[in-house]
């Protein structure tokens, strides 16, 4: 199995610092017997606390995965996914504890992670960053936004189009580190050769429609495509940090 991946981040046109973090580890460097580990995180909090939260969550999760590699080798899909979720819950506690000191109170971060293992995609997710699967020429969101407007969409109060421009569109309902415990969305997704994966923070999808993202992701080299996504977000206003990870799969 061959996995190629590329990640990049951009501060945007409005913010003066970047609170996003990401990690890309592929075959030979990926932990837990995986072909790839891909994570984006979008921090929040006063001063530099958001940057601390996103970086801390990713670094501690990767360290935990490295330590769990020997335990993960023989696990079936369900147990493997549960292990990933449990590791993120432990990281949540660490970020929450770090957020109890002055200057970092209330800090937290989104966390969207994908692990490719044995031709299966494992997804763990908290917050409103997103994971997409591009397969058969169609871009499909495989995470659910933990946001106030998404809850209203599910209740039929707002349409998707109304949610994108609603004043409360940035209010999230779940994040790593905001509380001592967190609920983690988790899923195993079928993948096939030729598929592409996209992970992004909301600096992209809050400004760029999924239909346009689909058009950009459909072809081109990963690095050029990632830069095109960031350029498009900045052209649409660039009012937030934008982080992109793209991966292509070949079996």
Task: Give short role names for the model-derived ranges.
Residues 1-251:
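PP2C/PPM-type serine/threonine phosphatase catalytic domain
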